[in-house]
Curated annotation (Swiss-Prot):
GO terms for biological process: apoptotic process; cell differentiation; mRNA transport; negative regulation of transforming growth factor beta receptor signaling pathway; protein homooligomerization; vesicle-mediated intercellular transport; viral translational frameshifting. It comes from Homo sapiens. This is Retrotransposon-derived protein PEG10. Can be reprogrammed to form virion-like capsids that deliver engineered cargo mRNAs bearing RNA signals from PEG10 5'- and 3'-UTR into target cells. A zinc finger (CCHC-type) spans 293-310.
Length: 708
């Protein structure tokens, strides 16, 4: 019974599809016939002019013709107007439903019954969507006669449940970047269609993605009350800034027109004006060019008028080659907005990348996709300017040019750390080899292409990441770490590298939560706590401070703190005469107990092993991950407040700052300077302090001259 029912449904759907196609063909034939009759009627009316005495007869004839002619048929759709096949893609569900609704609304006479509508929508499905429809109609027969319920079931199955979450994530990451306001506004409104935000929320989010110069100009204007008004203001500001920038450009003086070099055997036609419209050739000139086998268009030999190069150079603008334009839609999707440059379009495939550095602003950089490059490369000057952390490669790589010779910059010995890189809504973790690439700061080569296997349309410069690797690895959105807190005051250290300010290490940012209340009882390497304390002999005579009384809430908080730490084994009985100073701070609804152990440490024996595993704790230069250049401005107060003396850069080097988890060295770019006043600089402290030199060995005993 089930197979028979399925066959009946399939046969009925096929019959309806054939009827729709036949009806469309008949409509097309009727339209062509009506058009021919209309043209013939118009021609006859122009040829025959009615006389005044035959007006009554003409009126009767026209009335009879109007009565005999059938009414004009309702304009029907061509087969090309049918909706596109739906294969179950959630992104194409809304357009498919809208196309089906529009098609059926235009032909209400044919789709007046729900059964016909359901069969038509089912016939427009393919793949897994068609399999779902057949199984659903077989189990639920009532859906065949209930079109709204069938559409609701299809929407419930194929609609993306995370559509709003994805749109929210996209719109928060959307930035104007180097693109225009119009492109940014179009992308913003496309994403906002999937959100249920109100007008003020959309206005605030639109403000967040604008570029800095547009936001600065908006601060001088009145606040817009709607999103459309705000978009209009931004477009007006951008055009005004573009006009001002064009007016500031120096105008080049007019250049004299230089005629191209013409062969001596060619005679210039004086009837052809330079730069104007071409005049018709005389019959004598045509005959002369035909006899000499010259081109009828430009008058030179070697070709004919069909493939004359002068036509191509005239049709294409100056500076561009003839042919289709190479600038197409953005290759990074609606999240990153790119605009083509004002100059001639580049023959290379370029995309806009976003490089996220923890605790720092996002870097926007143009990258070239080159299938001839073996790896992913980044320019060393760009690395030095932006302070991107590096490490030494396990094995150096020798890069060869197209002629087989090694490049002038030498082998590649450094690479960047794993960086979070965005290409539109495509996010990945990349590591670049550092080399010399002045024209393109970033180059994505065969390694990147083979890993992601993108679908590139070279004619339109569009990229689609639809491979299995990208589906499971690259479309996972991970939150970008927030900005780092302001750096703590530096210790009083000074190095003769004036002009560079040292910052706290970024690599320790990922372990900043090791001292949270969740991890306060966890020790590294499962090491057991050793609370044994040894006192200095005679510590009982050390004077103690004052003892103050506590209130009932403070005493209860102190008892709870002591009981909890005794239970965890962090506090044990001791024979020390004095304890640590206790200070209670109100945090929210409870009192937080803090204590100062500096006084008890004065009469206890300190352990000799280092208390932290961070190497060279006191040396801030070893902890630096990047440096920032500080310009020499008169009156600029340097930090620390030591007197700054002029230094002279003599070279560039990579400074070691530590090792990563795999044991590879970490390097940062620094400037090597020479300071002639080095003797006037404060002394550099050493950690640990240097040990005194060992005493000299005793002198050898004097030789003995005793004889036997």
């Amino acid at each position: 019974m089930t197979e028979r029912r399925r066959d009946e449904l399939s046969e009925e759907i096929n019959n309806l599809r054939e009827k729709v196609m036949k009806q469309s063909e008949e409509n097309n034939n009727l339209q062509s016939q009506v058009q021919k009759l209309t043209e013939e009627n118009t021609t006859l009316r122009e040829q025959v002019e009615p006389t005044p005495e035959d007006e009554d007869d003409d009126i009767e004839l026209r009335g009879a013709a109007a009565a005999a002619a059938p009414p004009p048929p309702i304009e029907e759709e061509c087969p090309e107007d049918l909706p596109e096949k739906f294969d179950g893609n959630p992104d194409m569900l809304a357009p498919f439903m809208a196309q089906c609704q529009i098609f059926m609304e235009k032909s209400t006479r044919d789709f007046s019954v729900d059964r016909v509508r359901v069969c038509f929508v089912t016939s427009m499905m393919t793949g897994r969507a068609a399999r779902w429809a057949s199984a659903k109609l077989e189990r639920s027969h009532y859906l065949m006669h209930n079109y709204p319920a069938f559409m609701m079931e299809m929407k419930h199955v194929f609609e993306d449940p995370q559509r709003r979450e994805v749109a929210k994530r996209k719109i928060r990451r959307l930035r104007q970047g180097m693109g225009s306001v119009i492109d940014y506004s179009n992308a913003f409104q496309m994403i906002a269609q999937d959100l249920d935000w109100n007008e003020p929320a959309l206005i605030d989010q639109y403000h967040e993605g604008l570029s800095d110069h547009i936001q600065e100009e908006l601060s001088h204007l009145e606040v817009a009350k709607s999103l459309s008004a705000l978009i209009g203001q931004c477009i007006h500001i951008e055009r005004r800034l573009a006009r001002a920038a064009a007016a500031r450009k120096p105008r080049s003086p007019p250049r004299a027109l230089v005629l191209p070099h013409i062969a001596s055997h060619h005679q210039v036609d004086p009837t052809e004006p330079v730069g104007g419209a071409r005049m018709r050739l005389t019959q004598e000139e045509k005959e002369r060019r035909r006899k000499l086998n010259l081109c009828l268009y430009c008058g030179t030999g070697g070709h004919y008028a069909d493939n004359c190069p002068a036509k191509a150079s005239k049709s294409s603008p100056a500076g561009k080659l003839p042919g289709p334009a190479v600038e197409g839609p953005s290759a990074t999707g609606p999240e990153i907005i790119r605009s083509p440059q004002d100059d001639a379009s580049s023959p290379h495939l370029q995309v806009m990348l976003q490089i996220h550095l923890p605790g720092r602003h996002t870097l926007f950089v143009r990258a070239m996709i080159d299938s001839g490059a073996s790896g992913n490369f980044i320019d060393h000057e760009y690395v030095a300017q932006n302070g991107i952390p590096l490490r030494i490669k396990d094995w150096p790589i020798l890069v060869e040019a197209i002629d087989g010779r090694p490049i002038a910059s030498g082998p590649v010995v450094h690479e960047t750390h794993d960086l979070i890189v965005d290409l539109g809504d495509h996010r990945e973790v990349l590591s670049f080899d550092v080399t010399q690439s002045p024209f393109f700061p970033v180059v994505l080569g065969v390694r990147w292409l083979s890993t992601h296997d993108p679908n590139i349309t070279w004619s339109t410069r569009s990229i689609v990441f639809d491979s299995e690797y990208c589906r499971y690895h690259c479309r996972m959105y991970s939150p970008i770490p927030p900005s780092l807190p302001p750096p703590a005051p530096q210790p009083p250290l000074y190095y003769p590298v004036d002009g560079y300010r040292v910052y706290q290490p970024v690599r320790y940012y990922y372990v900043q939560n090791v001292y949270t209340p969740v991890d306060e009882h966890v020790y590294p390497d499962h090491r057991l706590v050793d609370p044994h304390i040894e006192m200095i002999p005679g510590a009982h005579s050390i004077p103690s401070g004052h003892v103050y009384s506590l209130s009932e809430p403070e005493m209860a908080a102190l008892r709870d703190f002591v009981a909890r730490n005794v239970k965890d084994g962090l506090i044990t009985p001791t024979i020390a005469p004095n304890g640590a100073q206790v200070l209670q701070v109100k945090r929210g609804w409870k009192l937080q107990v803090s204590y100062d152990c500096r006084a008890p440490n004065n009469f206890t024996i300190q352990n000799q092993y280092p208390r932290l595993s961070i190497p060279n704790l006191e040396d801030q230069a070893h902890l630096a991950t990047y440096t920032e250049f500080v310009p020499q401005i008169p009156g600029y107060q340097t930090y620390p407040t030591y007197a700054a003396y002029p230094t002279y850069p003599v070279g560039f080097a990579w400074y070691p700052v530590g090792r990563d988890g795999q044991g590879r060295s970490l390097y940062v770019p620094v400037m090597i300077t020479w300071n002639p006043h080095w003797y006037r600089q404060p002394p550099v402290p050493q950690y640990p302090p240097p040990q005194p030199p060992p005493p000299p060995p005793p002198p050898p005993p004097p030789p003995s001259y005793s004889t036997l």
